[in-house]
Amino acid sequence: MRLAEGTGLLRSDFIEQDGILCVNIKPHPWRSLKTTSSARLIPLVGSSKWAAEKILALPDDNKFAFPRYNDGVKTNANSASAALNKWLKGKIGQGYIIHGFRHSMRDRLRAVECPSDIIDQIGGC
């Protein structure tokens, strides 16, 4: 998932499908998608499921999953990126950026010969 996709999520974008918690990546007026094929449903497991459950457990006084980065008109993914990169630098030092995780995931999926259409469904194309 691209950072802007996640940053612009609504709480209602987290849905249950066939008993599995998923995130529905779709365009919103405040955040478009890079391509039409970027719209997708991503199943959440492990720490991503845990994080989604924490978001959904918060008081629902705001429709956004990350209200700090949304004003209803625009998603500020650059601010989210800067905050995450600052946090990451404090944890593992220089030389890593948050955007690298998406590319690492795609590289690891290719390394285990995951079909490219599945890689695109997970990471967007």
Predicted features along the sequence, with ranges:
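C-terminal catalytic core of tyrosine-transesterase DNA break-rejoin enzymes
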Residues: 5, 86, 100-125
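Conserved tyrosine-mediated DNA breakage-rejoining catalytic core shared by Y-recombinases
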Residues: 4, 8-53
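Active/binding-pocket-proximal capping segment
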Residues: 13-15, 19-24, 61, 83, ...
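Active-site lining segments that contact anionic ligands and/or coordinate catalytic metals
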Residues: 20, 39-41, 61, 93, ...
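Active-site/catalytic core of tyrosine-dependent DNA strand-transfer enzymes
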Residues: 28-29, 45-94
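Residue-level marker of regulatory loop/turn positions in helix-turn-helix DNA-binding domains and
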Residues: 36, 98-99
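Residue-level signal for well-ordered alpha-helical positions
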Residues: 9, 54-58, 112
